[in-house]
């Protein structure tokens, strides 16, 4: 039979889990922010018609749409 955890042990376990979840949340938020920045950069490039050729524009559009699709999932 598995012994029950003491209140102190439960609290330590909760604290460790909450800390790990907070770190994971911060990492996820940073990744989302990076994706937003990259998407905005690419969209800004698309708004400058002289700066990119048609094939480059198509590639940028494809990349932006792929990123948006990943974000929705």
From Swiss-Prot:
GO molecular function: protein-macromolecule adaptor activity
GO biological process: attachment of meiotic spindle microtubules to kinetochore; chromosome segregation; positive regulation of mitotic cell cycle spindle assembly checkpoint; sister chromatid biorientation
Positions of disulphide bridges: none
Domain of life: Eukaryota
GO CC, one annotated term: chromosome passenger complex
Family note: Belongs to the borealin family.
Protein's UniProt name: N-terminal-borealin-like protein
Species this protein is from: Saccharomyces cerevisiae (strain ATCC 204508 / S288c)
Gene: NBL1
């Amino acid at each position: 039979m598995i012994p029950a955890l003491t209140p102190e042990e439960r609290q330590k376990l909760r604290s460790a889990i909450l800390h790990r979840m907070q770190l994971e949340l911060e990492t996820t938020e940073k990744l989302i922010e990076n994706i937003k920045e990259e998407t905005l950069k690419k969209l800004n490039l698309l708004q400058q018609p002289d700066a990119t050729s048609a094939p480059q524009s198509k590639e940028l559009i494809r990349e932006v749409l792929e990123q948006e699709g990943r974000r929705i999932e």
